[in-house]
Amino acid sequence: NYYLAGTLLIPVLASLFILPLGMYFFRIGVPVSGLLGGLIGTFAGGYYMRSSIGRIDTDMLNLFFPVLAGLLILLAGKAKTERNVLLYSVGAGLSLFLFQWWYARVAFTLAYFMVLVFSLFVKKIRFRAILVGAFLFVLCVEPATFMSGSGSAEGFLKNYFVFEETASNTVIDDGTTPATFPNVFKTISEADTVHMDEVFRRILSNITLDWVGFLAFFGLAVFRWRVLLPLVPMLALGLLSFQSSNRFIMYLAPFIGIGLGWLLQLGVEGVFLLITKNIDHRDVEDKEVKRKRLKAKDSLWAKIIVWLSMDFYANGRAPKGTKNAKTNQQIAAKEG
């Protein structure tokens, strides 16, 4: 029963992309971004509707494979040895090979190939390792599939960048009768273009939070662009939702969460930093107060000792040593 199997797999597969996304941002030092990116990406209206139970579609894994490929490319760039670079390149190729089985869009292969080569170049990996890694990547995704990537990308752009209705001419009895037919993609609800506010509303109901997360992500990208390069193909698809088809909203949603997560992490780290500084400042103040008190006590005892000594001599009393010396002198005088 394929329908029953698909229905039971949806709750598991639709949220599976959270794992590689969380690992990705944990490796680059922004774990909260991975957490919120996964949560908002899962429960965004645009993706939640397309991966609901009962709707058996390829969308349930269309986020998992791109994020997994991005994670493996990131690990290839961070690898310490040439052997690990090649292993992660093979892993990225195999993940996209499986993606072709799941969702036959060869353009993904070409896009991630360019990202892999550029990321390794930015990380200053040896040219030999880049060359071998690229070869293994192409070998794993299947060379014939890779060679058809440019044609797939061209067809994709033609489908999603036609904004005007096309016209067709029909010839009847040697006469030409013009007839206008609508663009087929405009008749599909998920391929329709929606306003920018509606795009954000299908991610989070609060548009202000959407804008904050969207701008925050680009702020994060300015500082950490090298480690975010493997996510560029997925981000490009997400940005298409503003101009082309609303089906790409599901690719944009995780980036809103990533931006909000980065701001949240900055806020939490800032609060802990202020608390730590406040505690350290109090410790310094306490030590200074204790030192002054100790110094005041020492000064007080010194004053008491001086005062007692002065009072002792003022009353005509001498210390025991002085009195004994005078007595000894008197005895010696008498005996003499």
Per-segment meaning from a language model:
Residues 2, 6-120, 235-238, 336:
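Membrane-embedded helix bundles of polyisoprenyl
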Residues 237-276:
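Hydrophobic/aromatic-rich transmembrane helices and adjacent perimembrane loops
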Residues 124-131, 201-233, 270, 277-280, ...:
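Membrane-interface helix-loop-helix junctions at transmembrane boundaries of multi-pass membrane enzymes
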